[in-house]
Each structure stands twice: as C-alpha cells, then as structure tokens.
From Swiss-Prot:
Name of the protein: Formin-1
Similarity-based family: Belongs to the formin homology family. Cappuccino subfamily.
Pfam families in UniProt: FH2 (PF02181)
Keyword set, alphabetical order: Actin-binding, Cell junction, Cell membrane, Coiled coil, Cytoplasm, Membrane, Nucleus, Phosphoprotein
Organism of this sequence: Homo sapiens
Length: 1419
C-alpha cells in the first residue's frame, strides 16, 4: 500500500493570533505564529486550523512521484512572508476555480437511491477551515476518509498506524462509484450532481465512507490542489478511494465542484480535500501542483487528459498496498464568527471554475443573517434566498453559548474578517477510541438531486429547487457550490447563498418527485451530454456496536462532541435533508420537517427539535438504520486531514453504498472522472490493520456486520444481565398479578354488596306485594260471596240433572219443570228473585206468568254472567234474552222454559225444527232488543219481535221454544236429589207427553213409580266410590287457600331455623314433653333432649310477641303461625317450664359431679395409704438404701445415709452395671425376687408395689380443683332448691305433684352426699400430707407446697420400670424352676435300671415280620 501525504489546511479568519503547525511528509513538524491579519482579501481567512499530517516511516512517501508534495511549500526553510505570499496566490487561484465551477453548467451533485442502476454519490464540499473547525474538540467523529484521511484520522493524537483505518476502510464491499473515462479530453461535467456538505457522522470505522475527491476530466486548475488528496488516496486499496468525510465540524466546506472540461475533479484551494484517483487509483499529485501555483511540486499538469489521469491513477493503484500511512494531525481550533463566503459563478470557455471571491467584511454575516443575504449580493454571487429558506436557517441557528456544538459563534461577528483565536486544542488529547470510531461527519443537510432541467429553475430564483449542491453544516462559513448541467453552462448559476440556504433549509418543502432511492446505483441519465454518473448517497449498513462505541467515546473528549451529530447516512427525513436525483423532475427540495442548518449553530439545534440532545443523535438514511454508523469514529482527526491551504473549499464526494472491499480497477476506470464521490461503503479490509498503529486495539474478529446480518443476542448483553432482566420481568409480572387480584377481590366485594342490597330491596318489594295482594283478597271476598252463594245454590240441581238431559224435545222439556220447582225453592234464600212471580210458574200453561218471571231471571242471569265465566253450552246456542244477553246457557236458574243446563253434559241431538211461528230469535252475535218481551200481547204465541230475514236456525230448546210449546212437553215427575252422588245408570229416557196420551197407551202411561223406603241403604250401595262433597262457595275456597299459603313468622330467621331443627329432631309430641316435665321422668325425654329444650326455650321478648299475637289474632289466623312459634308457645304453656327443667337437669348433673369427686378423692386416699402401710414397699426402699450405701461406701458426703430423697427412684434405671448388661433396678428386682419373694415364679407371686396406673391417676388430681367443684355443686344445689320452691308456689295444684315430692327427696339426699364428700376430701388431704412427711419429701424449688402430681409421678415412673422388670424376671424364674423340675425327673428315671431281653429274630416269627415291615417302610 502506498501512502499519500496530504496537508489539508482548513482556514478560519484570525484577527490577532495564528499559530500554524505543519506536518511534512517526512514527519518534520514546523510551526510559526504571527499576529495581525494575514489575509489579502476576505476570502482568505488566515490559518484558523492548521492540520499537520505526518506519515510514519513505513509509508512510502510521495517523493516517489516526480512532483513534489503540494504542502511542502509550507515546510521549506522559507520565511513566513513567503508562505503567506504563496497562500495568497493559492487564494486567488481558489477564487478563480470556484468562479469557473460556479459558472459551469454542471456542478457536482448527489443522488440517492437506485436511479438507472447508478451508484449514488454524495459529493461533499468541505468549507474552509475557518468555518469548519472551531476547535478540534468540536469534532465528535473523524473523517471516514480512508487512506486519504490516514494522515488526518488522528491529527491530534500521536502518529498511529493506518491498520486501524484499514480495519475500517479495508472492507468497503462495493465501490459502485466507478469513474468512466469516456475520452481523454471528454469533459465530464457533473450534470445534476448535488454536493452534500455534511453527512452526520459517517459510517462506522469498518464502514467508513470513501470520500472521493472531485475529479475533473478536463484540466485542473493551475495549482494541483488535489495532489495531497491523491497522494493520500494511494494508501487505500485501489477499490477504496477515500476522501475526508465532511461534517459540521468542517464549518462550511466549500462544495465540491467539477470543471466540465477537466478530466479531474477540481478542489478549491480552501478545501484540501483528499481525493483518490479514479476508483482507488491514486492520482498523480502533479495535476494539482499546476493548478495551485507553487503549492505542490508533486502535482502534475493541470491540463492532463483523462488518459493521463487514468495512467496517473493507475500508479497509485499499484502502490496502494505498499504504503502504510499513519497520519498525525496537529490542529489549532479557534472559534470564529460565522461567515458566509460569496461564491461567484463565472463562465469560462474552456472550463468551469468557481471563484470564491473575497467579500467585504460586511459580507461575512452573523449566524442570524447567514442565509438572508441581500438581494444585490445574491445577484452578484448567488440567487436570492427565499424567505422560507431564511426562516428555516434562522430557526435552525443555535445559541452562541452552546460550547458542545460544532462551533459556538457569537451573532455579533458580522463583518469580521479575523477573530481572536479561541483555545487551541491539542491534537494529542484526541479521542483514543479505536480506528473504527474516529470517522464520521454529522450530516446536517443533504439536497435531493434533480435533473438538469431543475437546475435551470433554481437559477430563476427557486430556493435551490433545481440546484445540485449540498453543503456541510458549517458553523461559520458555508462554501456554496452551484453547478449546472453542461447544457446550462452558459446560463448564470444561482447565487451561492441561495444554494447554501437551500442546503441548510431542512424545512423546505419536499418535492413531489423527491423520492428516497435505494442504494443501488442508477445508470447515467440519458439527457446528460457526457458520461456522468448520478451521484447518490447509498445507505451504508453499519454495525450498531460501533455506533455505541462512538456514543461512549466521542462525547467525552474535551468538548469535541458534536452533541447532535448524526451519521453521514443521515438522510432520514426526520433528521436531515435527503439528497436524491429525480430524473427529470421538479426541483429537489430538502425533506420537509428537517431543520435547516445554520453555520455556527450547534448541531443539535440544527437538527431540529427532538434531535437536540447531549449525546449524538444517530440519523441514518431511510434504508440504513442509525445504528449502523460509528459515532465514536468521527473525531477531530478528519478535519485535520483537510487544512485549507488558502481558505478555499475542497470539493469532496461521498459515495454511499453497500460494503464492498474492492472493485476491479477497470470498473473504476469506467466511472466518470469528473464526478465527486463520497464512499460510504463499510470498510471490511483486514489487510490495513497490519500497518496501523493500534491506539486501542480493536478486535479483527468478528468482522463488522452489515445491516442485513442479524444481531446476536449475546453481543448486546451478558448472561447476568439477561437473568437480571428476566428476574425483573418476573417481579413485575408477579406484582401485576397481585394488583389484578387485589382489584378483582375489591371489585367482587363491591359487587356482592350491591347484589345483597338489590336482593334485600327485591325481597322487601315481594313482601309488600304479598301483603297488598292478601289485603285485596280479604277486602274483595265479601262482594263475591253473595254472588257465589247464589250461584252455588242455583247450580247444583242443574249440575246433576243436566247429566240426564239428553234426548228429544219432549223428554228434554220435562226435567225443566222439575228443575223450576227446585229453582224456586232455592232462590228464596238469596231473595233476589220475585217470589210471587216464581210461585205463579207452576201452571204449565200459564204463559203470562212465565213471561212475567222472565224479568227477574234475566237480571239474575246477567249478574251471573258477569260474576262467573259461562260454562260450556250443552246445546246449540239459544237466542238472546230480551234484555240482550248473549246466550241463555250461562243463566241456569231459569223457569221451566229456560235454556239447557250450564255444565258440560254430552250435547243432546238437535231438537226437531219448530213451527215457523216459533222460530224467530236471531243468533247471539246480534242481540236485537225485544221491547215487547216483558208483556207479550199473545200469551200463546212467540214474542212479537220478528226474526231478521234469512235467519232460520233450528231453535234450541230454550225459553221461546218452551213458550210456544204446550205444558205436556214438560217432565211429569219432579227431580230427585240424592244426598250423595250416585253412580249413573245409562238408559234411554222416555218421557210421556200430552200428545202421547192421545196415542196408543203404553206401559209407561200407567206405570207408577214407588217410593224408596230406605234410600240410605241404596245410596250407600250405589253411591260413587270417591265421595265428592258439595263445593263450598268460592269465597271460602279462596280464604282457605290464602291461609295455607301465608305463614306468619314472629321469630328471627336464624332463631326460627334453630327451633325448627330442634322440632324435627325431637320426634316427640308435646304431650310427652309435658308428662316428662310434670312427672320428673327422664325415661321418655332424656336429659340431653330436656337440656336442648331448656336452652331453646322462648325468651321474654319472643314470648311477649307470641302471646300478643295469640291474644289479638283470630283462631284461623293462629293456624297460620309458623311451627317454631307455635312450638315455643306450647312449651311456654307448661307452668314454670324453665324452673322445672332446670331442677330436673340439675338432679342428673349433681349425681355425676359428686360421683367424679368421690372417685378422685378415693384414688389419692388409696395411693397414700398403700405407700404408708404396704410392707413390700418398705422392703424395696430398704434394699435400695442398702445398695446405695454400699455403692457410696467411703464417700463422706453420700455414704452412710439413713435415707434418701425419693427423687432418685426414677433415676435408678440409669445406673448401669460395669458391662452395661443390667441396671440397678434390674438388680433390685432380681434380688427381691430371689431373697424376698418366696412365691417368685409362681402364680401366687404378687407385685410388691402399688399399681402404676393408680399413681398416674393420683398425679392428675389437684386438690384446688376438687375444692372448687364441691363449692360449685353446693351453689347449684342451693339455686335449684330455690327454683323448686318457686315452682311449688306458682304452679297449679294439679301440676304440682309428683314434682314436689321427688325434688324434695333429691335435695335432702344431695345435701348429705355433699357433706360426706367434703369430709372425704379433707381426709385425703391429710393422708397425702402424712405420706409426704413420712418419706421426707420436700417441694420443688420455687414451690411452696408439694403437689400430688410431683409425688405420685415419681412413684409412677419407678413403679412402671419396676413392674416391667418384675414381669420379665418372674418369667425367667418360672422357666428356671420348670427346668429344675425336669432335671429332677430325669434323674429319677435314670436311676431306675430296666432290663431288656433281646429276642432272636430268626427264632420268632413275629420279630421277623416286624423287621420286614420296618425294612419296607424305610425303603
């Protein structure tokens, strides 16, 4: 890799003091100071920031080139005057260059996105250092310049190896900005190329953009201004041309320009931007040398053709891997007031140059007026800025006091050429961050590219709508750059201020055709006259980790933090303007909503609200996340690479694109040479790291990730952080669940309360409705009673008789006669009918009487129809009554001529048609009034009212039919009413009429019906099985139903429930309870039941309520009282129930209590006596005393004891033998059984000590409890006796006996028993005290008396152990005795000798058989 030496001097006007420090390519450092103004004109601001770039010895210097390094003129042994002279010359050339460039039709532009397949290029104009560098500390990041910046990357730091930058630059994956060498002299104007002045912090160290120095296809300016940059480019790989990325820190770098006729990019002298030769090919420095008079001897001829340029660029490409540039930048940064340098666009025939003319002091406007230049000046030097741009620029200005910004410039700097230098920040204190964190320029604005047509619009006064210039956000001086397409070359270019304002006017409206384009390079515009690439900014994927490193690194370096600096790819609409090129379209506007950047304004403010933060705001182009750019990498080193030699502006191009480490040299040759590039490709080259001096070592592996790669979780946090986060989430989850549960419980509680209230309210409403309904039933019964009674009286005969009404007309009319008689008699009761008229109905032929009787019948029938529902008609509907009734069916109590019965018998067959004279009444629906019916004129005929025409239904057997018929049609026999319902006899009735008498006589005419003498017998035999009583009046039935339904409760709900449960569990009648109480008999009612009755007896207040209800209520209402109330009332009816029950209960309680006391006293008495009087107890104690004295023999304190405390008895089992085989208790028991118990081992043997269980029971007794129980029994006895006296006084005499006699006898006996138990208790206490004294026992420490529990527990433990061992030893002794007995028996048997004679088996047949059998069995 060959390294290039480039001294980039970015000037700012200095009034009082200027210290210039230079870094020779060989590493020599010189510097000089001077006072006073050092500028010949206003365009030369003096050396504000003089950056010294020195490369290490391992870098191959540019001396290999035939031309001298352009910066060597400053480092020769020449006086300051000569240097200044050279600087002034450079200034003149820079002005001329800028003038030509501005007057040219094609200016470097920037395109974004994928347009025609061309890679968008971001041309950056680096403003003069006086605008750029307020202080090196203002730079948060360094230029992502690749090898061009190698020397400037750490200008203030000690020389560092370029390996760090190679790490960041080496892997630029795609170099899409290919320069196309169309022809040797073919001019390559930048048609529609916008120059972006700044990109907020360029990509990460590994993804540093390559800043392509503007390259002109035609001749360069006389002074080879690009020599330094070309030499610097050599240090890069050929595929990675890099130019210093500009940022706000550069102030207003002069925008990059291209001379349309030049084969190389023209850089104004102010901006010593480093440029690489065509794609990665180092450009010969001589080209710039001639353009810049005397600046650099190493530059080649400015008039070189593109072919020569290509050759020159190929040379550095070959040497790219040779040099290892390590740059050292020494920077002095001084704050100067914001200044705007007017850019005058002049037209030149052969080439276009932009001359930045020296402006008067008044031309340097303060921040507030930066973008609001007068119209005259705008006319001379640029298009007038519209008010919208001015407002945007002003709004984006920051207060002068913001020191953390790129520059804190006072607004009062208007007209100032040189200012008192501020602090000089030593470059040695620069950020020590790794190489990847040293690059970056906060991009504040980017201008969208438009087609050449739009540039013409800009000249017409549009606010940079058609301009293709993009400015770095320069704190003081903005280098305007306006270029037009070649076709527009002859037209005057818009003024620089307008271009500047447009660049900074981030709030300008976005063009409708302004679109974000993808990073894919777009093909050349067909309208371009020469092969020219569309410059776009390709979004460069960057590693978020690098940005985080930048965040951590850059803000902490001596106020060098751009508090708001955003990455170079900040083309996002929210943060910065976007540069795009829209083919053919309307003017490109900066994206709306993006604040305009104003020189001298802090980056935070210029970024707009929400972007002003203490930490760098990472902004990225739409396709590139802000995380992908190394904020830390952008340090002051980048500005140091660009010290302006004469205050001019170097034109740089950014090329943003996907990471591609190297492109073929041929591809780069194809790219347009006159284009400005800003490479934003991530640099993944690992080869450069070997040649870099590591400041802070940066890991080579893992390689930087692009945006497409997924981030690993492990890279962001550790396992501990992960666990902590999980725990935190779990804790929050748990708290949230608890809160939800609490809220749920509270809500449920409230809902339950509301539900209970609603339920109570509804229950109360139900009760009120029940009472109201009850009241209405009671109130309405009387009215209905009369009607129902009259109905009941009238209905029964008809109800029964109608069952038989079946057949023809004659037989049907006969029962009516009998019914009429009963009806007359029945209707006398309600007295609603005219009795006199009814009595006249008996003659069958008396039609007048019949008609007269109709009137009261009609009235009663109408009343009945209203009161009762009409029963179903058993016959066809009769004609209406004269009074207008609907039918006669609901009027049963009619005279003999009335209609059929009301109940539903089987309908009879229709009667025969009557004569026409008798058939006249219409059907029921139209009831015509019959006014003549009360007094019919013709007694024998039908009513005079004729029927309606056309109506002749068969007349039913009704009123009018009967009127027209003779009396013979009525039944001859009266109706019979049995006393009880009888079974029906289903015969066919024959009724003899008067007509039939004239006919042939029949049996039925002469047959007489006898009277039944004993109908009761007949009724009994043939009555219905289920006797149906006569229906009572409806009023009575309703009253009964109400009584059944309603239950009156006087007790509380729970109280009533408790008493109800008691009643259901008793299974007793009240008589049994009364008998048990009166007779003091617990055989039927046990004591538990009696106690339950006593406990649940009615209290005084309850009894008052019940008694009051019984006194005030009727008998029927008393039956409605609930059972618990009735039970308590009946129980209270027993005289003195409470006193009687208490006496009976106490009788049993007393007997149980006195028995328990007696048993306890007896246990203590017996145990005490046993210990005192049993001889074996004394023997055992004596044996223990002997063994103890023997064991304690020779001991003066324990030996020779006369006795011992009984506390040792339970502890004897703990005294083990020597071999631990037995303990002392075992030996005592064995010894006692061996020597004291003569019956040991036999059934006669008796346990020598009292039973352990007796001692245990005695230990549970307390004399205090016994005394209390006795006193309690005595009190209860006296109280019960008093209650017995009360019962005897108050109870009636009949209920007094046998209660009185039994209770008196009990109390006498109870008193005697109580006195006896008291004496027993006293004796037991005395016996216990005697025992204690007898054994010499003393109370425990802290106790006054010895309690039975203490004494008897000692004996209980000892006796339990003794008994267990005694049983075992007794068994052993029994076994020994049995064994001895067996042995004695054996001895006795052995002493006796038994002689046996052997038998010869052969001689005895029997013996032989026996042997044979034995042998057989054995076999």
């Amino acid at each position: 890799m060959e390294g290039t030496h480039c001294t980039l001097q970015l000037h700012k006007p200095i009034t009082e003091l200027c210290y210039i420090s230079f870094c020779l390519p060989k590493g020599e450092v010189r510097g000089f100071s001077y006072k006073g103004t050092v500028t010949l004109d206003r365009s030369n601001k003096g050396f504000h920031n003089c950056y010294q770039v020195r490369e290490e010895s391992d870098i191959i210097s540019l001396s290999q080139e035939p031309d001298e390094h352009p910066g060597d003129i400053f480092f020769k042994q020449t006086p300051t005057k000569d240097i200044l002279t050279e600087l002034y010359k450079l200034t003149t050339e820079r002005e001329r260059l800028l003038t030509n460039l501005l007057s040219s039709d094609h200016i470097l532009g920037i395109t974004m996105g994928n347009q025609e397949g061309k890679l968008q290029e971001l041309s950056v104009s680096l403003a003069p250092e006086d605008d750029c560098f307020q202080s090196a500390g203002d730079w948060q990041g360094e230029l992502p310049v690749g090898p061009l910046n190698k020397r400037s990357t750490h200008g203030n730091k000690k020389p560092r190896r370029s390996s760090g930058r190679r790490e960041s630059f080496g892997a630029l994956p795609q170099k899409r900005t290919k320069r196309k060498g169309r022809g040797g002299r073919e001019s390559a104007p930048l048609m529609g190329k916008d120059k972006i002045c700044s990109s907020h912090s360029l990509p990460l160290s590994r993804t540093r953009p390559n800043l392509w120095v503007l390259e002109e296809k035609g001749n360069l300016l006389p002074n080879g201004a690009l020599a330094c940059s070309l030499q610097r480019r050599e240090s890069c790989p050929p595929d990675i041309p890099k130019t210093p990325d500009t940022d706000l820190g550069f102030g207003s770098f002069e925008t990059a320009f291209k001379d349309t006729g030049l084969g190389r990019e023209v850089l104004p002298p102010d901006c010593s931007s480093t440029e690489a030769g065509g794609d990665g090919i180092r450009r010969p420095p001589s080209g710039l040398e001639h353009q810049q008079t005397g600046l650099s001897e190493s530059h080649q001829d400015p008039e070189k053709h593109p072919e020569a340029e290509k050759d020159e660029m190929e040379k550095p490409a070959k040497r790219t891997c040779k040099q290892k540039p390590v740059s050292k930048v020494v920077a002095k940064v001084q704050d100067l007031s914001s200044q705007v340098q007017r850019v005058v666009k002049t037209h030149s025939k052969g080439k276009e140059t932009i001359a930045i003319r020296p402006a008067a002091h008044a031309e340097f406007v303060p921040k507030a007026d930066l973008l609001t230049l007068p119209g005259a000046e705008a006319g001379a030097h640029g298009s007038r800025r519209q008010g919208k741009e001015r407002q945007g620029d002003r709004s984006s200005q920051s207060p002068a006091g913001e020191t953390a910004s790129i520059s804190s410039v006072s607004a009062s700097a208007e007209g100032a050429v040189n200012k008192v230098p501020l602090k000089v920040i030593e470059s040695e204190k620069l950020d020590e961050a790794p190489e990847g964190k040293r690059l970056g320029f906060p991009v504040h604005t980017s201008v969208p590219h438009t087609r050449p047509e739009t540039r013409n619009k800009r000249r017409a006064g549009l606010p940079l709508g058609g301009h293709k210039s993009l400015f770095l956000d320069l704190p003081h001086k903005v280098g305007p750059d306006s270029s037009q397409p070649r076709g527009d070359k002859k037209k005057p270019s818009p003024p620089a201020p307008a271009a500047l304002g447009k660049v900074f006017n981030n709030s300008a409206s976005q063009s409708s055709t302004h679109k974000q384009t993808s990073p894919v390079p777009s093909p050349l515009s067909p309208r371009l006259p020469s092969p020219q690439q569309h410059h776009r900014i390709l979004r460069l994927p960057a590693l978020p980790g690098e940005r985080e490193a930048a965040l951590n690194d850059s803000p902490c370096r001596k106020s060098r933090v751009f508090s708001g600096c955003v990455s170079a790819d900040t083309l996002e609409p929210p943060s910065s303007a976007k540069v795009t090129e829209t083919k053919g379209a309307s003017p490109a506007f900066l994206r709306a909503g993006q604040p305009r950047l104003v020189p001298g304004e802090t980056l935070e403010k210029s970024l707009g609200p929400g972007k002003t933060t203490a930490e760098p705001q990472h902004q990225s182009p739409p396709g590139i996340s802000s995380e992908g750019f190394p904020w830390d990498g952008f340090n002051e080193q980048t500005p140091k690479d660009l010290p302006n030699r004469d205050g001019g502006a170097w034109v740089l191009g950014y090329r943003a694109g996907p990471a591609c480490p190297f492109l073929l040299h041929e591809e780069r040759e194809k790219s347009n040479r006159s284009e400005l590039y800003l490479d934003l490709h991530p640099d993944h080259s690992l080869t450069e790291q070997d040649d870099r001096t590591p400041g802070r070592l940066q890991a080579v592996w893992p390689p930087p990730k692009t945006k497409d790669t997924e981030e690993k979780v492990g890279l962001k946090y550790t396992e501990a952080e992960y666990q902590a986060a999980i725990l935190h989430l779990k804790r929050e989850h748990k708290e949230e669940i608890e809160n939800l549960q609490a809220q749920f419980e509270l809500r449920a509680f409230h809902i339950r309360g509301e539900h209970a209230m609603i339920t109570a309210r509804l229950e109360e409403t139900i009760e009120n409705l029940k009472h109201e309904l009850e009241h209405r039933w009671r109130g309405g019964c009387e009215e209905r009673k009369d009607v129902c009674i009259s109905t009941d009286d009238d209905c029964p005969p008809k109800t029964f008789r109608n069952v038989c009404v079946q057949t023809d007309r004659e037989t049907f009319l006969k029962p009516c006669e009998s019914e009429s008689k009963t009806t007359r008699s029945n209707q006398l009761v309600p007295k609603k009918l005219n009795i006199s008229s009814l009595s006249q109905l008996s003659p069958p032929n008396d039609h007048k009487d019949i008609h007269a009787a109709l009137q009261p019948m009609e009235g009663m029938a109408s009343n009945q129809q209203k009161a009762l529902p009409p029963p179903p008609a058993s016959i066809p509907p009769p004609p209406p009554l004269p009074s207008g009734l609907g039918s006669l069916s609901p009027a049963p109590p009619m005279p003999p001529v009335s209609a059929g019965p009301p109940l539903p018998p089987p309908p009879p067959p229709p009667p025969p048609l009557p004569p026409p004279s008798s058939a006249g009444p219409p059907p029921p629906p139209p009831p015509p009034p019959l006014p003549n019916s009360p007094a019919p004129p013709n007694p024998g005929g039908p009513p005079p009212a004729p029927p309606p025409p056309g109506l002749a239904p068969p007349p039913p057997p009704g009123l009018f039919f009967g009127l027209g018929s003779s009396s013979s049609q009525c039944p001859r026999k009266p109706a019979i009413e049995p006393s009880c319902p009888m079974k029906p006899l289903y015969w066919t009735r024959i009724q003899i009429s008067d007509r039939s008498q004239n006919a042939t006589p029949t049996l039925w005419d002469s047959l007489e019906e006898p009277d039944i003498r004993d109908p009761s017998e007949f009724e009994y035999l043939f009555s219905k099985d289920t006797t149906q009583q006569k229906k009572k009046p409806l009023s009575e039935t309703y009253e009964k139903k109400n009584k059944v339904k309603k239950i009156i409760k006087l007790l509380d709900g729970k109280r009533s429930q408790t008493v109800g449960i008691l009643i259901s569990s008793l299974h007793l009648e009240m008589k049994d309870i009364q008998q048990a109480i009166f007779n003091v008999d617990d055989s039927v009612v046990d004591l538990e039941t009696l106690a339950a009755l006593y406990e649940n007896r009615a209290q005084e207040d309850e009894l008052v309520k019940i008694r009051k209800y019984y006194e005030t209520s009727k008998e029927e209402e008393l039956k409605l009282l609930d059972k618990p109330e009735q039970f308590l009332h009946e129980l209270a009816q027993i005289p003195n129930f409470a006193e009687r029950a208490q006496c009976i209960i106490f009788r049993s309680v007393f007997s149980e209590g006195i028995t328990s006391l007696h048993r306890k006293v007896e246990i203590i008495t017996r145990a005490s006596k046993d210990l005192l009087h049993v001889k074996s107890v004394k023997d055992i104690l004596a044996l223990i005393l002997a063994f103890g004295n023997y064991m304690n023999g020779g001991n003066r304190t324990r030996g020779q004891a006369d006795g011992y405390s009984l506390e040792i008895l339970p502890k004897l089992k703990d005294v083990k033998s020597r071999d631990n085989g037995i303990n002392l208790v075992d030996y005592v028991v064995k010894y006692y059984l061996r020597y004291y118990d003569q019956e040991a081992g036999t059934e006669k043997s008796v346990f020598p000590l009292p039973e352990p269980q007796d001692f245990f029971l005695a230990s549970q007794v307390k004399f205090e409890d016994l005394i209390k129980d006795l006193r309690k029994l005595k009190r209860q006895l006296e109280a019960s006796e008093k209650q017995m006296v009360v019962v005897c006084k108050e109870s009636p005499k009949e209920y007094l006996q046998p209660f009185k006699d039994k209770l008196e006898e009990f109390f006498q006996k109870a008193k005697k028993e109580h006195k006896m138990e008291e004496s027993h208790l006293e004796n037991a206490q005395k016996s216990f005290e005697t025992t204690v004294r007898y054994f010499g026992m003393k109370p425990k420490s802290g106790e006054k008396e010895i309690t039975p529990s203490y004494v008897f527990m000692v004996w209980y433990e000892f006796c339990s152990d003794f008994k267990t061992i005694w049983k075992r030893e007794s068994k052993n002794i029994s076994k020994e005795r049995l064994k001895m007995a067996q042995e004695s028996v054996s001895k006795l048997t052995s002493e006796k000798k038994v002689e046996t004679k052997k038998i010869n088996p052969t001689a005895s047949l029997k013996e032989r058989l026996r042997q044979k059998e034995a042998s057989v069995t054995t076999n």
